Regions:
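Generic L/I/V-rich hydrophobic alpha-helical segments across diverse proteins
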Residues: 43, 56, 63-66, 70, ...
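Hydrophobic alpha-helical transmembrane segments
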Residues: 59-62, 75, 82-101
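Anionic N-terminal interaction surfaces
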Residues: 2-14, 18-53, 102-186
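Acidic, Ser/Thr- and proline-rich intrinsically disordered linker/docking segments
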Residues: 207-282
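Intrinsically disordered, low-complexity coil/linker segments enriched for acidic/polar
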Residues: 53, 80-82, 88-89, 147
Length: 282
């Protein structure tokens, strides 16, 4: 089966086109796409201006890492304060210098970000981008009652009939979870991103199966906390990199264009897709 919305690097390590583009029924106009890119460029410029200069950001990272490592080492030590200083005085110097530098740079960064992003130019750039995004979704026919949903994607290579998930660049988790607009009618499931609207006939869906396998996904996109409220039942946790650990996931199987496809769904999105498709997971 072919993984939907995932990236096949078997024959092209630089491939950036996801599987399933042939199922895009509607794309935004060239003018809309160009306006979006212009707005993205303006917004990204303002966001970049809101950051500290790169050398200071590097210094902040180095000081923070070194300071906290030294602090953890000191706290775990069973030696007395005087013994610890005699054995490793440099640890005290690292803590005394690095942590204050890290904290000062953190505060400066927050101040700079707030100052730059509160200017009229920055506000206009960000509002313009939001308006362009809304305009494209409207052009693609996304209704107001559509829902935001994470869908799992990944880079992979094939060997025979087997799929091997791989990383690309400085990727911190094997599974990515971009946000799509999703909705359905009596005939189709619609999956929409700014590049176009995918259409999957409900009649093509063969089932949803549960895969009881631990996975790590890139980040948490929801406003609600991942381990509270409606999400507490999934018993997810996180790590020092901010990735989310899931105990299982789901695969929606469908046949389209003469091929068998699989769409990977994180555990916490299953109720939404069951409701939209009318198919219960097995």
């Amino acid at each position: 089966m072919k993984p939907f919305l995932c990236f096949d690097l078997t024959n092209d390590k630089k491939n950036s086109v996801p599987n399933g583009e042939e199922f895009i029924a509607v794309k935004p106009s060239f003018a809309s796409s160009q306006s979006l890119e212009d707005s993205k460029s303006d917004a990204n410029e303002k966001l970049e201006q809101s950051k500290l200069p790169k050398p200071l950001r590097i210094l902040q990272t180095v000081c923070g890492f070194a300071g906290f490592i030294a602090l953890v080492g000191f706290l775990r030590s069973t030696a007395t304060l005087s013994e610890a200083y005699q054995n490793a005085p440099f640890i005290f110097w690292i803590i005394a210098v690095c942590l204050p530098v890290w904290f000062v740079l953190l505060m400066l960064g927050l101040y700079r970000k707030k100052k730059v992003l509160s200017t009229e130019e920055s506000i206009h750039a960000l509002e313009s981008l939001e308006g362009r995004v809304d305009a494209i979704y409207s052009e693609l026919g996304v209704p107001e009652n559509s829902r935001d949903a994470d869908i799992l994607t990944f880079f992979y290579k094939t060997k025979g009939d087997k799929i091997k998930i791989c990383s690309k660049g400085a990727q911190i988790a094997p599974y990515l979870n971009p946000i799509y607009k999703v909705f359905a009618d009596f005939e189709n499931l619609y999956i929409v991103e700014l590049g176009g609207k995918y259409v999957i006939p409900l009649s093509s869906i063969k089932g949803i199966r549960t895969v009881k396998k631990h996975i790590r996904i890139a980040k948490w996109n929801k406003e609600a906390v991942f381990n509270k409220g409606i999400y507490q039942q999934y018993k997810m946790n996180t790590d020092q990199y901010g990735t989310i650990h899931c105990r299982y996931y789901h695969i929606m199987e469908f046949e389209l264009g003469g091929e068998a496809w699989e769409m990977y769904i994180p555990c916490y999105e299953l109720p939404l897709f069951e409701r939209l498709t009318g198919v219960k997971a097995q």
